[in-house]
Amino acid sequence: LAFVLFAGILIGPFGSAARLFSQLKEAQGAMQRVFELLDTQPEVTDHPQAHTLPTIQGHVKFSGVDFTYDSRQPVLTDLSFEIQPGELVALVGPTGSGKSTIANLLHRFYDPTAGSIKLDGHDLREVTLESLYRQIAIVPQETILFGETIFENIRYGRESASEEDVIKASQVANAHDFITTLPDRYQTIIGEKGINLSGGQRQRIAIARAV
């Protein structure tokens, strides 16, 4: 009887130790993946003579652009087009036709295999990434919002932004009108992932943040 009681006492600690060991192994695997990510060298870097991109107007020119992912079939072949400043353009096509690739190339997440991409006459490979990223932004279809106020979500990209800056950005994104109808206006807590807002409202908040 004493042995059975003693074994019963030990089962709990041994079970906890086994669960802890399993959690530590999982954490070790996760940390290994984090370290591998941190050790990854960027494929796109600044050219030694790269210059700062001046304030852009928005003239985009693709000239004879080819692009291939990892030596696979070409995604883009001899693509050429121009977009004038202020012009609204929609890229339409089936899945895999290269729509996202064009956006990624414009943001210089990749460099083209051949041809050139120019913004206001500046080849993207000849300007610093920091000066490029400071002036352009992507608003994904799946918006990423935080369980904070509307004000903090819009200001997230530039914490030095004033209240006036935030309001101007929301006006550009056509978000100001619906924000002012909310009880707490810009101090409204939107919930995790913006759950308290509609899909369209979440998109406008994300656009305002990009602005």
Question: Locations of the language-model features?
Answer:
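Membrane-water interface of transmembrane alpha-helices in multipass transporters/channels
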Residues: L1-L5
